[in-house]
Amino acid sequence: LQELKTVAQSFVDNLSQFLIKNVVAFRHGSVQHIAPEVGTRTGLRSIGKYLLTEDDVLQCRKFHDAIANSSWPIEEWGQQRRVNIRYFAEQDFYQVPAGCLQSKSISNLFFAGRNISSTEGAIASARVMGICLQTGYASGCMAAAEALGLSQNDAVKQVQNGQL
Protein backbone atom coordinates (compact mmCIF):
# COMPACT_ATOMS: atom_id res chain seq x y z
CA LEU A 1 0.00 0.00 0.00
CA GLN A 2 2.84 2.40 0.72
CA GLU A 3 4.07 2.08 -2.87
CA LEU A 4 0.57 2.86 -4.18
CA LYS A 5 0.34 5.86 -1.89
CA THR A 6 3.70 7.16 -3.16
CA VAL A 7 2.65 6.70 -6.80
CA ALA A 8 -0.72 8.37 -6.17
CA GLN A 9 0.89 11.35 -4.40
CA SER A 10 3.36 11.77 -7.26
CA PHE A 11 0.50 11.66 -9.78
CA VAL A 12 -1.45 14.33 -7.85
CA ASP A 13 1.65 16.54 -7.62
CA ASN A 14 2.48 16.19 -11.33
CA LEU A 15 -1.09 16.75 -12.47
CA SER A 16 -1.60 19.81 -10.27
CA GLN A 17 1.68 21.35 -11.47
CA PHE A 18 0.72 20.68 -15.09
CA LEU A 19 -2.70 22.33 -14.62
CA ILE A 20 -1.25 25.34 -12.81
CA LYS A 21 1.36 25.83 -15.54
CA ASN A 22 -0.82 25.16 -18.61
CA VAL A 23 -4.45 26.00 -17.82
CA VAL A 24 -5.35 29.62 -17.15
CA ALA A 25 -8.27 28.72 -14.86
CA PHE A 26 -5.85 26.85 -12.55
CA ARG A 27 -3.05 29.46 -12.61
CA HIS A 28 -3.51 30.33 -8.93
CA GLY A 29 -4.80 26.92 -7.86
CA SER A 30 -3.50 24.57 -5.22
CA VAL A 31 -4.37 21.15 -3.83
CA GLN A 32 -6.01 21.59 -0.43
CA HIS A 33 -6.90 18.01 0.41
CA ILE A 34 -6.43 14.49 -0.88
CA ALA A 35 -7.65 11.20 0.57
CA PRO A 36 -5.54 10.19 3.58
CA GLU A 37 -5.03 6.67 2.26
CA VAL A 38 -5.28 4.69 -0.94
CA GLY A 39 -8.69 3.07 -1.34
CA THR A 40 -10.60 5.61 0.75
CA ARG A 41 -14.11 5.89 -0.68
CA THR A 42 -15.29 9.06 1.03
CA GLY A 43 -13.83 12.15 2.62
CA LEU A 44 -14.93 15.70 3.25
CA ARG A 45 -18.62 16.27 2.49
CA SER A 46 -20.07 19.20 0.54
CA ILE A 47 -23.04 20.99 2.11
CA GLY A 48 -25.82 21.75 -0.32
CA LYS A 49 -29.30 23.18 -0.15
CA TYR A 50 -30.44 19.64 0.68
CA LEU A 51 -28.55 16.88 2.47
CA LEU A 52 -29.39 13.41 1.12
CA THR A 53 -29.65 11.07 4.10
CA GLU A 54 -29.41 7.35 4.71
CA ASP A 55 -33.12 7.47 5.58
CA ASP A 56 -33.92 9.04 2.18
CA VAL A 57 -32.17 6.09 0.53
CA LEU A 58 -33.64 3.32 2.69
CA GLN A 59 -37.17 4.78 2.55
CA CYS A 60 -36.92 5.26 -1.25
CA ARG A 61 -37.82 8.92 -0.93
CA LYS A 62 -39.04 10.78 -4.03
CA PHE A 63 -38.55 14.51 -4.64
CA HIS A 64 -40.34 17.08 -6.83
CA ASP A 65 -36.94 18.40 -7.98
CA ALA A 66 -35.38 14.96 -8.59
CA ILE A 67 -32.51 14.90 -11.07
CA ALA A 68 -31.35 11.30 -10.59
CA ASN A 69 -32.85 7.91 -9.76
CA SER A 70 -31.06 5.00 -8.11
CA SER A 71 -31.78 1.46 -7.05
CA TRP A 72 -28.27 0.74 -5.76
CA PRO A 73 -28.14 -0.50 -2.13
CA ILE A 74 -26.06 1.07 0.62
CA GLU A 75 -22.67 -0.64 0.51
CA GLU A 76 -20.35 0.07 3.39
CA TRP A 77 -16.83 -1.27 3.11
CA GLY A 78 -14.95 -2.15 6.27
CA GLN A 79 -11.54 -3.52 7.13
CA GLN A 80 -10.19 -6.56 5.26
CA ARG A 81 -12.40 -5.70 2.27
CA ARG A 82 -15.59 -6.81 4.00
CA VAL A 83 -18.78 -5.19 2.81
CA ASN A 84 -22.07 -4.65 4.60
CA ILE A 85 -24.90 -4.24 2.09
CA ARG A 86 -28.26 -2.82 3.14
CA TYR A 87 -31.09 -3.17 0.69
CA PHE A 88 -34.36 -1.27 0.47
CA ALA A 89 -37.73 -2.36 -0.90
CA GLU A 90 -37.47 -4.62 -3.93
CA GLN A 91 -38.61 -3.03 -7.22
CA ASP A 92 -38.31 0.48 -5.69
CA PHE A 93 -35.77 3.29 -6.01
CA TYR A 94 -34.83 6.58 -4.41
CA GLN A 95 -34.23 9.95 -6.00
CA VAL A 96 -31.51 12.56 -5.62
CA PRO A 97 -32.96 16.09 -5.44
CA ALA A 98 -31.37 19.06 -7.21
CA GLY A 99 -30.67 20.67 -3.84
CA CYS A 100 -27.90 18.10 -3.28
CA LEU A 101 -26.05 19.57 -6.25
CA GLN A 102 -26.09 23.27 -5.33
CA SER A 103 -24.03 24.79 -2.54
CA LYS A 104 -25.94 26.04 0.47
CA SER A 105 -23.79 29.17 0.69
CA ILE A 106 -22.37 29.87 -2.79
CA SER A 107 -25.08 30.25 -5.44
CA ASN A 108 -22.89 29.44 -8.45
CA LEU A 109 -21.13 26.39 -6.98
CA PHE A 110 -22.47 22.99 -8.02
CA PHE A 111 -21.54 19.43 -7.05
CA ALA A 112 -21.63 16.10 -8.87
CA GLY A 113 -20.67 12.48 -8.34
CA ARG A 114 -19.21 11.53 -4.98
CA ASN A 115 -19.23 15.20 -3.96
CA ILE A 116 -23.00 15.70 -3.75
CA SER A 117 -24.42 16.92 -0.46
CA SER A 118 -25.09 13.73 1.51
CA THR A 119 -24.41 11.86 4.70
CA GLU A 120 -21.85 9.05 4.84
CA GLY A 121 -24.65 6.47 4.76
CA ALA A 122 -26.35 8.01 1.73
CA ILE A 123 -23.16 8.40 -0.29
CA ALA A 124 -22.44 4.70 0.33
CA SER A 125 -25.22 4.16 -2.23
CA ALA A 126 -25.03 7.34 -4.32
CA ARG A 127 -21.32 7.19 -5.21
CA VAL A 128 -21.81 4.60 -7.98
CA MET A 129 -21.28 5.34 -11.68
CA GLY A 130 -24.96 5.73 -12.67
CA ILE A 131 -25.58 8.45 -10.09
CA CYS A 132 -22.24 10.09 -10.88
CA LEU A 133 -23.22 10.35 -14.56
CA GLN A 134 -26.73 11.64 -13.81
CA THR A 135 -25.55 14.22 -11.26
CA GLY A 136 -22.69 15.31 -13.52
CA TYR A 137 -25.10 16.03 -16.36
CA ALA A 138 -27.61 17.77 -14.09
CA SER A 139 -24.94 19.80 -12.30
CA GLY A 140 -23.57 21.04 -15.63
CA CYS A 141 -27.06 22.01 -16.78
CA MET A 142 -27.76 23.80 -13.51
CA ALA A 143 -24.45 25.67 -13.71
CA ALA A 144 -25.19 26.71 -17.31
CA ALA A 145 -28.64 27.93 -16.26
CA GLU A 146 -27.07 29.95 -13.44
CA ALA A 147 -24.56 31.51 -15.84
CA LEU A 148 -27.36 32.41 -18.28
CA GLY A 149 -29.53 33.90 -15.55
CA LEU A 150 -32.23 31.22 -15.84
CA SER A 151 -34.10 29.99 -12.78
CA GLN A 152 -32.96 26.75 -11.18
CA ASN A 153 -36.57 25.52 -11.20
CA ASP A 154 -36.66 25.86 -14.99
CA ALA A 155 -33.27 24.15 -15.30
CA VAL A 156 -34.45 21.21 -13.15
CA LYS A 157 -37.64 20.84 -15.21
CA GLN A 158 -35.61 20.82 -18.41
CA VAL A 159 -33.23 18.19 -16.98
CA GLN A 160 -36.23 16.09 -15.90
CA ASN A 161 -37.74 16.35 -19.38
CA GLY A 162 -34.44 15.70 -21.17
CA GLN A 163 -34.57 19.11 -22.86
CA LEU A 164 -31.11 20.39 -21.93
Question: What are these regions, as identified by a protein language model?
Answer:
Residues 1-164:
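Flavin (FAD/FMN)-binding glycine-rich loop and adjacent Rossmann-like elements that form
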